[in-house]
Amino acid sequence: MDDSTHTCQYNEEDGSMRMYIRGRPVVLYGPSDHDTLDPAKVAPPPQSKLKLEWVYGYRGKDCRSNLYLLPTGEIVYFVAAVVVLFNVDEQCQRHYTGHTDDVKCIAIHPNKMIIASGQCAGHDRLDARPHIRVWNSVSLATLAVLGSGHIERAVACLTFSRADGGSLLAAVDEGPDHTISVWEWQRPDKGHCVAETKCSVDTVVAAEFHPLDRNQIVTCGKGHIAFWTLDASNVLYKRMGIFETRDKPKYVTCLGFNHNGDVISGDSNGNLIVWGRGTNTIQKMVRGVHSGSVFSVCSLKEGAVVSGGGKDGRLVLFDADLQPTATENVIEGHYGGVRVIAEGRGSQLFIGTTKNCILHGDMELGFLPAVLGHVDEVWGLAANPALPQFVSGCWDSLLQLWDPLSHSTVWSKDIGERAQSCAWSSDGSVIAVGCVSGKWLVFDPVSREMVAHHVDGVEPIQTIQYSPDNKYVAIGSRDNFIYIYQVDDNCSRYSRLGKCLGHSSFITHLDWSEDSQYIRSNSGDYELLYWNATTCRQITSPTSMRDVVWASNNCPITFQTIGVWPENADGTDINTCTRSHDNRLAATGDDFGKVKLFAYPVTQPKSLCHQYGGHSSHVTCVRFLLDDSRLVTAGGLDTSLMQWVVE
């Protein structure tokens, strides 16, 4: 395919623009009163900009050591490519956005102000290398960028030295040798790697500098715990922990230290083991603390120790000698198991869970959620047309209603089906959810009860949209059909009018006309087709539709969105498109984690935009809230939702 994929050709005679997506020509007709276009002209970006206001979600499903409390009262954690600093008491967030792809680990400097975070390889060719960023948590200024070109695949673990005041930073990567490297991160020459060696052929899940002994590092993972020494000539050597005849675990899953400087490890057998300071031998074993793996062991200020079960969800309190106390707690199963325990103020604890929630509370009174997240791909997103609310639907079967002003979950419901798409009725009275199975369900947002249930085909329902007059709903399926239903009885009764046949690929997006008579739709092979909604017939003359006023612009392939397509677009670039209710802005989400903001209409093939990172996966849906004050974006596989203020 030549480089002229997106060379648009404008035909002055009929006011049409021919553009190519993946070599396929698409002819788009402008309104009859549209001024003649000069395709060479460059449209400026909008005056409005986006500012990241809130990030919903937390990555506890598959990452460890990812939750800490700072002296500012903020908890620090990550999701997607953002490190979040969240003050739970004051309900405010700040964000470190220096990363270009998934953040996989963080470490806190002994001064409790400096943070290191490590990422995986990125989409951007320039920033494709996995690397470590060291930054100031007060100013959010980046202090050092380390390891680009050294680190393979991703940074798995990070730890600052503690006995010497944090001059060294150790990292373990996710390459085949799980290389451990030690960095003098403050060196002016972008940090200096002082030592590097193979750590283990097996997975490494945790690494910690010893809090009292200089140049001692402990790592653990599949079938091993290793005690490392960095000697005077900067050579790393290790002694493996000796399990002797005792039942060697499949995984050593977490590390901690007691006040004497002994190492405490938790493992997949549910045991806690104390390794005497400076040795590689077992001093004490507490068996069967948890059924299933111990995912976190946390030493508290007064010397007590809390362990958390990844499977059983139990939190067990021990005294300083690792004798069990009578105190334990269990977190509710729907929040997941315990991923990490972080000590808060006083007796307070923060708990990160395996279902991407963060809970806070104490062992006596129990725990409440501070962060609720999705745990699988998020595709469904829709803004309430009547109230400042939005709803998200996910492959984890959760439907969640959010209040963007208080940044809180109004409710979360397990609908028993993997959700693919969401829509509100035009009056905001119901929420329709398209599912992966071909089912689509309708819910009352106040009672949360299901009011209707239908099935169309066995493929995912990719998009669902009510007509502006609320009399119809259109359901676009992966089976290439659009199903049209008549809507009665306050959106609780649905009767099928028919299905629209004509697309040769799956339906991706659709819009209704303002008068509720017509539908336009895009498909997986980049078609734009028009339909008479009540007859379900295709309108084969696109010129007859050029002056129709559309109630939305969710279809990215339209005359009004020509300029959102980049040069050499291969069609998979843009997953989602929307326009603001005042018709001044268009927003898109792409396969590279980018959210873009354009001035609407985007009719110039060369249109400049403002571009924003934060998501690390494909951005699956973007929607403006009803007053256009904010844009909400869904991050697909990164499981996050992000809320941006339009400034």
Predicted features by range, described:
Residues D2-E647:
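WD40-repeat beta-propeller superdomains and closely related acidic/aromatic-rich repeat-like regions
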